[in-house]
């Protein structure tokens, strides 16, 4: 399985996440909605073929030991990803969260002026939170 093609599609389609899981069709999350890709259901062998594409030997050993690993990966010309691989009942699974190359400003995010002013306060602790 060519992970680079999957990640390229994910970025090009504007997806925030690429979800891979044994027993399921690969899916992307676009604007909060999970959308299946036009692919076959993933087998354990498919997932195992992905690991060497993104993990070095030390990371592979760590994953085998802990059955879970968090790391970052990059795809030249496309961007960076926060990655979590883990084991579940059906087998291995992984999620690639796209890290935007350009951080959006307040206007692009549609943040109201009152929240913008709060975020720019230079003393104290102000938390602006939302979905991840």
What spans do the regions from the language model cover?
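N-terminal "pre-motor" subdomain/linker immediately upstream of P-loop NTPase catalytic cores
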Residues: 1-118, 122-127
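The conserved Walker
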Residues: 131-132
């Amino acid at each position: 399985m060519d992970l680079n093609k999957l990640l390229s599609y994910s970025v090009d389609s504007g997806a925030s996440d690429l979800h891979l899981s044994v027993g399921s069709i690969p899916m992307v999350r676009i604007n909060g909605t999970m959308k299946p890709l036009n692919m076959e259901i993933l087998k354990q062998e498919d997932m195992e073929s992905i690991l060497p594409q993104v993990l070095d030997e030390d990371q592979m050993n760590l994953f085998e030991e802990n059955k879970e690993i968090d790391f970052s990966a990059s795809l030249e010309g496309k961007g960076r990803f926060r990655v979590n691989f883990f084991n579940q009942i059906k087998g291995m699974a992984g999620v690639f969260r796209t890290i935007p190359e350009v951080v959006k400003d307040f206007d692009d995010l549609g943040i109201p002026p009152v929240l913008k002013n709060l975020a720019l306060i230079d003393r104290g602790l102000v938390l602006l939170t939302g979905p991840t």
